[in-house]
């Protein structure tokens, strides 16, 4: 099994990205492939989950370990496969999903692709209370998350002051959510994306 891959992002399609390392190109299915568009031909680190089937070995990739943990929780539910779990992650913020499960909000959960009432009920039964670690609810995690967000916000404000538009920065900010960098590192990495 693979935990993560580090290599050059060589290709982006509507469903997957390709990361090249040691002369091999790995096809990795991700929730929002175009969120990686600023990193083509640059080194990236993608967290992985491997699914082995009779007819294929598939890799699913994630921006952060938290996103991967949520995916793993989702596929543990009867009726939710990797593709459906990825679709859920693609159309929702993690907080909304966690809140819906913990509050038994079936109506909210059935808005997701391929999630009917029965599967939504199963999600609530199986996952209620299990997203605490993945969503960063411990005191330590909240503190770290707050510091990360503060640095990221400061970097975005600096880029706004440099003349970049909020619409341009929205995609950049989304890419770095959940990462842990200094203000200077965020600015430097963001500029690389914006200059592509």
UniProtKB/Swiss-Prot annotation:
Q: Does the UniProt entry include the keyword Endoplasmic reticulum? A: no
Q: Where is this region: Domain I?
A: 1-63
Q: Which residues form a coiled coil?
A: none
Which Gene Ontology cellular component terms are annotated? cytoplasm; Holliday junction helicase complex; Holliday junction resolvase complex
User: Where are the stretches annotated Domain II?
Assistant: 64-142
User: Which key words are in the record?
Assistant: Cytoplasm, DNA damage, DNA recombination, DNA repair, DNA-binding
Q: Where is this region: Domain III?
A: 148-196
Question: Which residue ranges does the record annotate as region Flexible linker?
Answer: 143-148
Recall the GO molecular function terms of this protein's record: ATP binding; four-way junction DNA binding; four-way junction helicase activity
**Location in or out of the cell:** Cytoplasm
One GO process term, biological-process aspect: DNA recombination
* Domain of life of the source: Bacteria
Domain comment quoted from the record: Has three domains with a flexible linker between the domains II and III and assumes an 'L' shape. Domain III is highly mobile and contacts RuvB.
Annotated function: The RuvA-RuvB-RuvC complex processes Holliday junction (HJ) DNA during genetic recombination and DNA repair, while the RuvA-RuvB complex plays an important role in the rescue of blocked DNA replication forks via replication fork reversal (RFR). RuvA specifically binds to HJ cruciform DNA, conferring on it an open structure. The RuvB hexamer acts as an ATP-dependent pump, pulling dsDNA into and through the RuvAB complex. HJ branch migration allows RuvC to scan DNA until it finds its consensus sequence, where it cleaves and resolves the cruciform DNA.
Q: Which family does it belong to?
A: Belongs to the RuvA family.
Q: How does it assemble?
A: Homotetramer. Forms an RuvA(8)-RuvB(12)-Holliday junction (HJ) complex. HJ DNA is sandwiched between 2 RuvA tetramers; dsDNA enters through RuvA and exits via RuvB. An RuvB hexamer assembles on each DNA strand where it exits the tetramer. Each RuvB hexamer is contacted by two RuvA subunits (via domain III) on 2 adjacent RuvB subunits; this complex drives branch migration. In the full resolvosome a probable DNA-RuvA(4)-RuvB(12)-RuvC(2) complex forms which resolves the HJ.
Report the protein name in the record: Holliday junction branch migration complex subunit RuvA
Q: Which organism is it from?
A: Streptococcus agalactiae serotype V (strain ATCC BAA-611 / 2603 V/R)
